[in-house]
């Protein structure tokens, strides 16, 4: 597959922070984070192939291809080194980016994600998601799954915007994403991640159960853990102010180092 340059949103100046969304997501889900982080950083939020503003692009069935497309896009933007934030499936893409280009990643945030793409303990199995997708179609599936990402389901203030974005995924990408996740396994490479890493998890996450989070935290050598109470899978939408504090606090040391070395 020929790798495309990905649509993206960019704002701010300084050290680069790259935001990678998850399954049925898109760059617009990071709007609040782009606004906040751009006060301190050069922020780039990408749309993975098949999703959001990239729904015209064919989605790969391998995580490594998503990672290569992100790296190609950053190359074209002239960005060499960057902080990396990956959510859900985007966390798998982020782990692939670290594996492909470890020297380019400064700090890593693995948020609501894991190292096992079959996602044991998920609200439903990948096989069942594929069945429901085939039966119900993308739009119905997108709204149904989006509800599981929020503590208050459809009653959450964030639901409509999240679900509307999810319905923009192409049918091909919705299928390809499930295939890519189920086939992916990053457990053997966790101990090789040398970047300072922040693992973030909402304690009521119905997509990624605690054993997945614990595996990241205990296996990545320089990992810290933040567990946010009373939140589900999309805590950056449920508790954005707290999420911003966690990110900025984690990146603060590097800000200080950059200032003192310039």
Residue map of PLM features:
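Flexible "cap/lid" loop of the alpha/beta hydrolase fold
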Residues: 95-100, 105-135
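Conserved alpha/beta-hydrolase catalytic His-Asp/Glu region
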Residues: 118-124, 135-191
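Conserved acidic catalytic loop of the alpha/beta-hydrolase fold
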Residues: 65-82
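Catalytic histidine-centered segment of alpha/beta-hydrolase-like enzymes
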Residues: 231-240, 244
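Short beta-strand/loop motif that positions the catalytic acidic residue
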Residues: 193, 199-201
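Acidic catalytic loop of the alpha/beta-hydrolase fold
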Residues: 204-208
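Alpha/beta-hydrolase fold catalytic core
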Residues: 1-18, 38-42, 75, 79-80, ...
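Conserved HGGG/HGGXW glycine-rich cap/lid loop of the alpha/beta-hydrolase fold
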Residues: 6-56, 73
């Amino acid at each position: 597959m020929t790798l495309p340059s990905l649509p993206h949103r960019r704002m701010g100046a300084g050290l680069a922070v790259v935001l990678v969304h998850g399954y049925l997501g898109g760059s617009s889900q990071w709007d609040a984070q782009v606004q906040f982080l751009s006060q301190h950083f050069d922020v780039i939020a990408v749309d993975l192939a098949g999703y959001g503003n990239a729904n015209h692009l064919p989605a790969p069935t391998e995580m490594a291809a998503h990672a290569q497309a992100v790296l190609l896009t950053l190359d074209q933007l002239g960005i060499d080194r960057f902080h990396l934030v990956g959510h859900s499936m985007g966390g798998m893409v982020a782990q692939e980016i670290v594996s492909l280009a470890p020297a380019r990643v400064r700090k890593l945030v693995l948020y609501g994600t894991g190292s096992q793409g079959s996602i044991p303990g998920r609200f439903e199995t990948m096989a069942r998601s594929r069945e429901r997708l085939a039966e119900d179609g993308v739009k119905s599936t997108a709204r149904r799954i989006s509800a599981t990402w929020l503590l208050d389901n459809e009653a959450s203030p964030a639901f409509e915007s999240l679900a509307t974005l999810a319905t923009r995924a192409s049918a091909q990408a919705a299928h390809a994403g499930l295939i890519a996740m189920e086939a992916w396994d990053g457990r053997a490479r966790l101990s090789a991640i040398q970047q300072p890493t922040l693992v973030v998890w909402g304690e009521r996450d119905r997509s990624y159960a605690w054993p997945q989070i614990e595996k990241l935290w205990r296996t990545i050598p320089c990992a810290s853990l933040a567990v946010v109470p009373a939140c589900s899978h999309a805590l950056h939408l449920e508790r954005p102010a707290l999420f911003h504090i966690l990110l900025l606090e984690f990146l603060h040391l590097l800000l200080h180092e950059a200032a003192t070395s310039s």
